Amino acid sequence: MNSIALSIGLSALSGFGDVEFHGVGQTAVSVVDDVETLDTRLIFGAFGESEGAVYGFAFETVDDLDDVGLFQAYVGADFGGLDVTVGRFQRNFSAELATSTFGYTYGLTNSTVFDRYDAFVEGLSLGGEVGDASFAIDVIGDDVFDGDSSTVSGRVELGALGFGFIGEEFDVWTVDISDEKGFISYTDDNGDWTAVAQGVVFTIEDTFSGYGRVEYDHLDETTYAVGGKCEFRDGVAAIAEYDDRDEGVRFGLRFSF
């Protein structure tokens, strides 16, 4: 699926439409149990739209810039209000995932729910909008027409409210409310539930912001993360964060365009 979508995307880039280049890079130091680790990652892609058709592909560095792998590759079209996408794309499931950029969320770490499921999948996606309501259904697998080898996930939104699921029988489902400052969600995975609240707590002159995340789950465990983010200019930010889950302190620099 990756090679097919990539070859189609390359042909589309040379054939029609305006192309925009987007990407994100981040380098972060983590200190956990007095052990320091450095992680650096770059993602770069080209995306275009022309006469109802959309297409794009992106690559990511692997193993701290030692190698490069395919991150995203898809083609799509708008059929009178029904959007169809084929290839490797971002899954439709939660508010946290919907507001992420190339898999990066507001801070340096993601919620437990976000990290539990693949953010990018291969298959076919159908979606559309009607007023304030929108929906997207993903059929995931090498053969999307084979019910035994494919799975389904999706998301429905009505204003600030959202509902997402994974599996034909809703084995995993989430309900959330979100805005530009954060979200509150409740996710059930075969009876094991997790509640998450994340958001910006304060801002100073649109340059510095403090944020936090709290999780509470079916095991009666509460974890949290707190951080600060300083945006030097559009797309460039320094972030510091403490995550209670591993008692780790992280410092990072991120740029996006």
Predicted regions and their residues:
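Transmembrane beta-barrel strands of outer-membrane/channel proteins
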Residues: G23-V29, F57-T61, V86-R88, I137-G141, ...
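Short Gly/Pro-enriched turn/cap motifs at secondary-structure boundaries
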Residues: V113-Y117, G212, G228
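Gram-negative bacterial Sec-dependent N-terminal signal peptides
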Residues: M1-G17
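Detector for outer-membrane/organellar transmembrane beta-barrel domains
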Residues: D132-S134, G147-E221
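Outer membrane beta-barrel
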Residues: L13-S30, D34-D142, R155-G159
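C-terminal beta-signal and adjacent terminal beta-strands/loops
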Residues: D234-V236
